């Protein structure tokens, strides 16, 4: 079997990893093995973070909507149920933006939800 010399491939791989680890402290930015471990961990954490970000924003929107609905005398779950019954199809991001930037319009949405719940 012929001998495989990996000079170019290995160099390319090492350069890629060391470029990704630029800015890391100490050997993590200079030594291939530790840099590779750090880069793998960083990429894994970045992937996880992108998934967690979606959950965190949803939690934030729900907390904001809940605070605004309670200020208008209704709980979050009853408000969402009332909106569904009223046929108002709005996502939580938009509802939270309205609650922050236009409280008057948000209180109208709460009234519409209350009306449907009482009917």
UniProtKB/Swiss-Prot annotation:
GO biological process, one term: ribosomal large subunit assembly
Keywords: Ribonucleoprotein, Ribosomal protein, RNA-binding, rRNA-binding
Alphabetized GO MF terms: rRNA binding; structural constituent of ribosome
Cross-referenced Gene3D superfamilies: 6.10.160.10, Ribosomal protein L20 (1.10.1900.20)
Keyword Metal-binding included in the entry's annotation: no
Protein's UniProt keywords contain RNA-binding: yes
Gene Ontology CC: one annotated term: ribosome
Residues in coiled coil: none
Record's function text: Binds directly to 23S ribosomal RNA and is necessary for the in vitro assembly process of the 50S ribosomal subunit. It is not involved in the protein synthesizing functions of that subunit.
Database matches in HAMAP family: Ribosomal_bL20 (MF_00382)
NCBIfam families per the UniProt record, alphabetical: rplT_bact
UniProt record similarity statement: Belongs to the bacterial ribosomal protein bL20 family.
Matches recorded under PANTHER family: 39S RIBOSOMAL PROTEIN L20
Protein name, as recorded: Large ribosomal subunit protein bL20
Gene this protein is translated from: rplT
